[in-house]
């Protein structure tokens, strides 16, 4: 039929239009060592392709090549694939090419805010103490009132005393709707 690499692959999955692979790709690498399509080959010698159609009649996303409405963040493979390392792990985007696991160590250990010096309080007593201390803690200071808008330099413009323009200007300047 055609020479598209997706036809010669063993899996019958949609192929990404960006990288030509069956894996997640941002277009800068391939996750499959199979041949990569540049979108210039044709499926029929009589037809010319712009690289935006597939042999599958279902609508295809132009971003990722999947057969569903796409926002560009889905994968063809149910296992998530890291864009940097290419491994099938769930990634938070902070991975490197080093496969060794990375553990974050805090700069200093967390010290408790309340220290019990004597006795063995129960969990209910500690909860009551924390609730009382939380309720008496200072609240946020009241917000500063908005400065008055009367007496602005615009009020000193020289309009006649009975001018409708002055009244309208003052209303527009000082009255918020």
From Swiss-Prot:
Pfam families: ACC_epsilon. GO terms for biological process: carbon fixation. Stimulates activity of the AccA3/AccD5 biotin-dependent acyl-CoA carboxylase complex. Interacts with AccD5 and modulates its carboxylase activity for acetyl-CoA and propionyl-CoA. Inhibits activity of the AccA3/AccD6 complex. Is also required for the activity of the long-chain acyl-CoA carboxylase (LCC) complex. Induction: Protein level is maximal in exponential growth phase and declines during late log and stationary phase. Interacts with the AccA3/AccD5 biotin-dependent acyl-CoA carboxylase complex. Interacts with the AccA3/AccD6 complex. Is also part of the long-chain acyl-CoA carboxylase (LCC) complex, which is composed of AccA3, AccD4, AccD5 and AccE5. The four subunits are essential for activity, but AccD5, together with AccE5, probably plays a structural role rather than a catalytic one. This is Biotin-dependent acetyl-/propionyl-coenzyme A carboxylase epsilon subunit. It is uncertain whether the five sets of tandem repeats at the N terminus are required, or not, for maximal enhancement of carboxylase activity. GO terms for molecular function: acetyl-CoA carboxylase activity; propionyl-CoA carboxylase activity. One of its GO terms (cellular component) is acetyl-CoA carboxylase complex. Residues 1-112 are annotated as: Disordered. Residues 18-100 have a biased composition (Polar residues). The gene is accE5. It comes from the Bacteria.
């Amino acid at each position: 039929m055609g020479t598209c690499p997706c036809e010669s692959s063993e899996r019958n999955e949609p192929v990404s239009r960006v990288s030509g692979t069956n894996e997640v790709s941002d277009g800068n690498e391939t996750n499959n060592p199979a041949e990569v399509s540049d979108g210039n080959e044709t499926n029929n010698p009589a037809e010319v392709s712009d690289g935006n159609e597939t042999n599958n009649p279902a609508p295809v996303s132009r971003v990722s090549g999947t057969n569903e409405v796409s926002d560009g963040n889905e994968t063809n493979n149910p296992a998530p694939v890291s864009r940097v390392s290419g491994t099938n792990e769930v990634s938070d985007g902070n991975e490197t090419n080093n496969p060794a696991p990375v553990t974050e160590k805090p700069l200093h250990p967390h010290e408790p805010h309340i220290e019990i010096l004597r006795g063995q309080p129960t969990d209910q007593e500690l909860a009551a103490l924390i609730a009382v201390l939380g309720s008496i803690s200072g609240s946020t200071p009241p917000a500063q009132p908005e400065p008055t808008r009367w007496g602005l330099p615009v009020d000193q413009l020289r309009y006649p005393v009975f001018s409708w323009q002055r009244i309208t200007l003052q209303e527009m300047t000082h009255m918020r709707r």
